[in-house]
From Swiss-Prot:
<dbReference type="InterPro" id="IPR036576">
    <property type="entry name" value="WRKY_dom_sf"/>
</dbReference>
<comment type="similarity">
    <text>Belongs to the WRKY group II-c family.</text>
</comment>
<comment type="function">
    <text>Transcription factor. Interacts specifically with the W box (5'-(T)TGAC[CT]-3'), a frequently occurring elicitor-responsive cis-acting element.</text>
</comment>
<dbReference type="GO" id="GO:0003700">
    <property type="term" value="F:DNA-binding transcription factor activity"/>
</dbReference>
<dbReference type="GO" id="GO:0005634">
    <property type="term" value="C:nucleus"/>
</dbReference>
<keyword id="KW-0539">Nucleus</keyword>
<dbReference type="GO" id="GO:0000976">
    <property type="term" value="F:transcription cis-regulatory region binding"/>
</dbReference>
<keyword id="KW-0238">DNA-binding</keyword>
<feature type="DNA-binding region" description="WRKY">
    <location>
        <begin position="141"/>
        <end position="206"/>
    </location>
</feature>
<feature type="region of interest" description="Disordered">
    <location>
        <begin position="248"/>
        <end position="287"/>
    </location>
</feature>
<dbReference type="GO" id="GO:0009414">
    <property type="term" value="P:response to water deprivation"/>
</dbReference>
<keyword id="KW-0804">Transcription</keyword>
<dbReference type="InterPro" id="IPR044810">
    <property type="entry name" value="WRKY_plant"/>
</dbReference>
<dbReference type="InterPro" id="IPR003657">
    <property type="entry name" value="WRKY_dom"/>
</dbReference>
<feature type="compositionally biased region" description="Low complexity">
    <location>
        <begin position="86"/>
        <end position="99"/>
    </location>
</feature>
<feature type="compositionally biased region" description="Polar residues">
    <location>
        <begin position="262"/>
        <end position="271"/>
    </location>
</feature>
<dbReference type="GO" id="GO:0006970">
    <property type="term" value="P:response to osmotic stress"/>
</dbReference>
Length: 287
């Protein structure tokens, strides 16, 4: 009966029997080993210092059927370095991942921090200008800028098409007033001045207007509204009055009867009696 603790290794079927290799077999394995190592770029020679290497190789050949490679201790360090280099080359994803890590980090940081928004200039919408009513007046005058009771500031002038006379632009000097006016002479009749007003004044006049501009307005309403003294009468009225007085003085006046002394009572001349004459009557002073 076979003892399970002590198996019989003398049987031919045992996989653990010791094989004795001939010199021809050892040369065969040496050639295969050198060929395999030369494929990897290793020029290694079989060392006779390790007699058990052939035995180990023979056992692996019998059990697995794969040709073993014998590596001596002298080349163990160089083989380890070569294997490490080979493993690094066989795994490029690790190297690429390590090199791509900074790029991924920069991309992540870029995603976290939003790009600075460029300031958009707010375009102010131009308010539509309300068209003011216009009034035009034609006046015969030698002066272009007629007096109308307001103060104006000239801010522009330009030539008029088909007219030798330029057009002047004025603006009211009051900061709250938006009234404008244009002054130009007529190309047909140079003696006529065309004044065009745009808008209405929101303030009182500066002073009493000069010239004959009052003919277009009621003088009584103007003076009552602005509390100004009434306008003087027509100067021709004084001239007529003076002529009438002159004629009256030159005309012969009728002779009046001279009054007589009998008709007129005697007027007592006051005497210098002082205060006594005022207090004491004359009958008491002259008995």
């Amino acid at each position: 009966m076979n003892d399970p603790d002590n198996p019989d290794l003398s049987n031919d079927d045992s996989a653990w029997r010791e094989l004795t290799l001939t010199a021809q077999d050892s040369d065969f394995f040496d050639r295969d080993t050198s060929n395999i190592l030369s494929d990897f770029g290793w020029n290694l020679h079989h060392s006779s210092d390790h007699p058990h290497s052939l035995r180990f190789d023979s056992d692996l050949t019998q059990t697995t059927g794969v040709k073993p490679t014998t590596v001596t201790s002298s080349c163990s360090s160089s083989a380890a370095v070569s294997v490490a280099v080979t493993s690094t080359n066989n795994n490029p994803s690790a190297t690429s991942s390590s090199s791509e890590d900074p790029a991924e980090n920069s991309t992540a940081s870029a995603e976290k921090t939003p790009p600075p928004e460029t300031p958009v200039k707010e375009k102010k919408k131009a308010q539509k200008r309300i068209r003011q009513p216009r009034f035009a007046f034609m006046t015969k005058s030698d002066v272009d800028n007629l007096e109308d009771g307001y103060r104006w500031r000239k801010y522009g002038q330009k030539a008029v098409k088909n007219s030798p006379f330029p057009r002047s632009y004025y603006r009211c000097t009051n900061s709250r007033c938006t009234v404008k006016k244009r002054v130009e002479r007529s190309s047909d009749d140079p003696s006529i001045v065309i004044t065009t007003y745009e808008g209405q004044h929101c303030h009182q006049t500066i002073g009493f207007p000069r010239g004959g501009i009052l003919t277009a307005h009621d003088p009584h309403s103007f003076t009552s509204h602005h509390h100004l003294p009434p306008p003087l009468p027509n100067p021709y009225y004084y001239q007529e009055l003076l002529h009438q007085l002159h004629r009256d003085n030159n005309a012969p006046s009728p002779r009046l009867p001279r009054p007589t002394t009998e008709d007129t009572p005697a007027v007592s001349t006051p005497s210098e009696e002082g205060l006594l004459g005022d207090i004491v009557p004359q009958t008491m002073r002259n008995p």
